[in-house]
Design a protein with these regions (language model features):
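A residue-level signal for conserved active-site and pocket-lining positions in enzyme catalytic cores
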Residues: 42, 171, 287
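N-terminal secretory signal peptides that target proteins for export/translocation
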Residues: 1-12
Length: 309
């Protein structure tokens, strides 16, 4: 008779007398799966902070595969750290471990956690709002608080301002290298994280509203969180004009029209356009120019947009 052992990952093998499902996770513990460790921070690359984190990780296991999202998060900008995670993490393989360090509260009572998402990705970070968008998009399977007695770099207890190196890189490396299981991170917490409030996308009375979470920095395009399904409720056709209003809090920053296009080359240089970016979210741009610089439109949890015919 076949016997099943229930966990989050299984393989099936044939044995004499039937089929047995064996958990890939020893004794129901959860291991990261692929030795991949991905970093992001607001440290910049002008000094040795990022290299120190990677050195700690390689000291845990030289077999780790280390990658970066970015280390150019503006200093203390937790919202942008949250967005860069959700922009990139869904494209990484299941089992990937991410270390995100944008930590203006370093050394205080804020919790250090590892989030396991329903997609099977791990996020090692301070619980300060960094997980806002990841938790919404990928879902929360479990949250654990890092036990710094067991999961902290040796002889680092006198350091209070570099948890990126001493706690997050160290713990992330141990998890990614299967030195520890997810359950060995620390105590299980309620399935919730600190969340930054923002305007959720919505449609009402012939208008679509959303947030401007980020800029396409290199080109000055303005990215929103309005997807095609929501936008299509406006019944705007390709080539039509879109009425746009942009606010920062209660202050109106921009009001005007843009042409709805698939891509920039459909209009002359300098023409304002509305299009869908590579994440299939509505965006504002100027052919061969910066919409952000032209109209002083920026991004963050307080920036929101209204679209209409």
């Amino acid at each position: 008779m076949a016997t099943s052992f229930y966990s989050s990952s299984f393989k099936r093998i044939k044995v004499s007398g039937g089929v047995v499902f064996l958990s890939l996770l020893t004794f129901f513990n959860t291991f990261a799966q692929n030795n991949i460790l991905v970093f992001q921070s607001d440290f910049g690359l002008k000094d040795g902070a990022v290299s120190a984190m990677k050195g700690v990780a390689m000291g845990v296991s030289p077999d780790l595969k280390l990658f970066d999202i970015t280390h150019e998060i503006p200093a203390y900008n937790i919202w942008e750290a949250a967005y860069r995670l959700v922009q990139t993490a869904p494209y990484w393989p299941t089992g990937t471990v991410f270390v995100s360090v944008c930590d203006p509260g370093v050394g205080t009572e804020r919790k250090s956690v590892v989030l396991l998402t329903k997609s099977g990705h791990y996020f090692v970070t301070p619980d300060n709002g960094t997980l806002t968008l990841i938790a919404e998009q990928l879902g929360i399977r479990e949250v654990r608080e890092i036990d710094e007695v067991r999961n902290r770099r040796r002889n680092s207890n006198e350091s209070y301002t570099f948890h990126g190196r001493d706690v997050y890189a160290f713990t992330g490396a141990r998890l990614a290298s299967k030195t520890i299981t997810y359950e060995q991170i620390g105590q299980k917490l309620p399935n919730q994280v600190v969340s930054i409030p923002y305007q959720k996308p919505s449609f009402a009375q012939g208008r679509v509203q959303g947030t401007i979470p980020i800029l396409d920095i290199q080109y000055g395009n303005v990215w929103t969180d309005i997807d095609k399904k929501l936008f299509n409720q406006l019944e705007i056709k390709m080539g039509d004009a879109i009425q746009v209003q942009v606010f920062n809090g209660n202050d109106k920053i921009y009001e005007g029209t843009v042409k709805y296009v698939n891509t920039f080359g459909e209009v002359k240089e300098g023409v304002d356009v509305g299009y869908f970016n590579s994440l299939l979210n509505f965006s504002l741009g100027v052919n061969m120019n910066s919409f952000s610089a032209k109209y002083k439109v920026f991004s963050g949890s307080t920036w929101h947009i209204i679209l209409s015919k």
